[in-house]
Each structure stands twice: as structure tokens, then as C-alpha cells.
Regions:
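Conserved short "hinge" loops at termini or chain/domain junctions
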Residues: 1-95, 109-166, 177-181, 221-224, ...
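Small/polar beta-strand repeat architecture
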Residues: 165-190, 195-231
Length: 246
């Protein structure tokens, strides 16, 4: 999932996050990207959920997400606000957030200033206090914008803390195997735990937005067909802090 280094050292591609590094500085920037991704995503998700994300990313050789919930978390998605069905949330994902944090971390550590072609290193003899103040204000704005996006990412996960959908029927066939016919399985996966009438079951043989199976004692009947589950279990976020301009 890693943010690409060309998003920083190529001005056209990088835009607001260009740092104008040369080839010799690429290793430093790569180290910063790796550190920032792990640091901020662990704080955003909590350690166990971050590990779950890394496990999903490791499935594909190119490091892209496999599960739809992680695809949406990373890339962004528009969805209906669970608390206001007439309101659509346009969640932007985490790439811009991470780029802002990388920008702040790298520039802060290497004392750069922004020019028309990116951010260049300050020369102590030629730079003025105005240069330094402008540079500091710039990187603070980038950092605080990333904090905004960080909170949006946490809000997205919190909106899916518990997800509920209603099955059309639950049928036992053969004995001890139950098939749940359900048209909404958003962010559900094989191996997940669902709750039906207060009891927990493990999802198997999932067919997206169609059905899934679980195994349980024979002879069960269900009157309440509400299926609930947690798409992002073990979500334990750390709230970020804004940088003051005072």
C-alpha cells in the first residue's frame, strides 16, 4: 500500500507535497515513508487491526488490498451516513493523509523550504526569518490537514463498528449446516463472526450479497433474522493532536 516516492520527488505528480529530493536523498525519504505509514496507521487503527490490514496487503504481490473493507479504507468511498440516511459521506481514504504526514516529517527533519519546483534545502546564510516562518507555517498546515483526514478515517471505521442486515431466511440443510439467504453482506468475509438472536456463528462459504453458511446444533429455528457483525473488530484508535500556530 506504500505511498510512492514519486509522489514527493516529481513536482507534477506530487503537487502540494513535492519535496524536490535528488537521487541521493531517496533513501532518506523512503525511510520516512515507511516510518510514517506504520506509526500513523497503527495509531489510527490500533495494533491488532493494523496487523489485520498488513495481513490483507500481503496477499497480493503488489501490496494492494484484497478485502473490500480495506480497499475502501485506503482509497476512499462514498457511503450513506448510518445516522442520517439522507446524507452521503465522501470519505477520501488515507493516501493524502499519509502524504501530508510524510511531508511534515521529512521537511521538519531536513529543514527545507518550498520553491516553485518543490521544497529545497535552506541555506543558513541566504535564508531569512521570513523564509523559516513561511516554511514552518506551510508544514503545519499540511500536518493539520492530515489530522483532519486522520479523523475522517477513524470516523469511517466507527460508522462500521457494528453492521446490521436482515436475512430473508435461514434454512438447515443438511443437519447442523445452516444457509443464510441475505442480500447485504457488506464487508463480511469467511471466518468472520456474526450474531443472530444473541448467539455467535462463524461465516463459511460466503457468496457476496447472496448467502453464507454456518455450523451449529441441529434443529435451531430463528424468528429474528437480523444479522449483525463487526467489520473492523479490535478498533482501538489514538486521537491525534493539531499543531498550534501560536
Amino acid at each position: 500500500m506504500s505511498v510512492n516516492i514519486t509522489q514527493f520527488n516529481n513536482y507534477v505528480a506530487a503537487g502540494e507535497f513535492s519535496v524536490g529530493v535528488n537521487t541521493n536523498e531517496n533513501n532518506n525519504l523512503l525511510e520516512t515513508i515507511t516510518f510514517v505509514e506504520e506509526e500513523h496507521l497503527t495509531r489510527l487503527l490500533g495494533a491488532r487491526l493494523y496487523n489485520a490490514l498488513q495481513t490483507d496487503l500481503a496477499i497480493n504481490n503488489d501490496g494492494t488490498a484484497t478485502a473490500q473493507k480495506w480497499i475502501d479504507f485506503i482509497n476512499g468511498v462514498s457511503y450513506v451516513d448510518p445516522s442520517a440516511s439522507d446524507y452521503t459521506i465522501n470519505y477520501q481514504g488515507v493516501f493524502r493523509m499519509l502524504k501530508g504526514f510524510v511531508f511534515w516529517q521529512y521537511i521538519s527533519e531536513h529543514q527545507y523550504k518550498r520553491t516553485s519546483t518543490g521544497v529545497r534545502k535552506l541555506n543558513a546564510e541566504n535564508s531569512s526569518m521570513v523564509d523559516t516562518q513561511m516554511t514552518n507555517a506551510l508544514i503545519r498546515r499540511k500536518y493539520n490537514k492530515s489530522v483532519d483526514l486522520y479523523l475522517c478515517a477513524q470516523h469511517f471505521i466507527d460508522d462500521y463498528k457494528t453492521y446490521e442486515a436482515t436475512a430473508s431466511n435461514i434454512v438447515e440443510s443438511p443437519a447442523t449446516t445452516y444457509t443464510v439467504t441475505i442480500s447485504d453482506t457488506k464487508y463480511l468475509a469467511n471466518g468472520d463472526t456474526v450474531t443472530i438472536e444473541g448467539n455467535e456463528y462463524t461465516v463459511a462459504n460466503l457468496v457476496d450479497d447472496t448467502s453464507f453458511e454456518f455450523t451449529a446444533t441441529t434443529g435451531l429455528t430463528f424468528t429474528d433474522l437480523t444479522v449483525s457483525y463487526e467489520p473492523f473488530p479490535d478498533f482501538k484508535p489514538v486521537k491525534p493532536k493539531y499543531i498550534s500556530f501560536a
